[in-house]
Amino acid sequence: MRPKRYFCDPSLAAALLGATPERLLGDMQTLGMLFENLVPRDVRVFLSTYGGVDNSVHYFRDEKDLEVDLIVEHDGRWGAIEVKLSETKAGDGARNLKALERKVLSNPAAQNAAPAFLAVVVGKGSIAYTRDDGVAVIPMAALGA
């Protein structure tokens, strides 16, 4: 796993950019970058409410550029999350997640556990569902209280 830096609050970056809602809706690249900073922040907040030690969130990229936005570890278990602004990109995220799962489980000597979950968090989506490959697709709004 390699370190990746995130804004503590992506609204700070939006303010520095002078990004109004109207401007962001016209600039999907910047909106996507801000969204990819928002989800890790919120996942860290959610995870902080769980008891126990060893709760952590990491970014993963290997030497072949397989990349997964978030690896969540809690209580000896792990899961992986890809972040996509649009639900239409959920398939891309699911492919990365399944590739990571295959990589982790392909070394029998390591005796790695299977992931507790694989999920794509999307900014624009109507409902949460599980794809045929077992990857959950979850709209960000569904994660709120």
Task: Say what each PLM segment does.
Residues 1-145:
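A cross-kingdom feature that marks ATP-driven nucleic-acid transaction machinery
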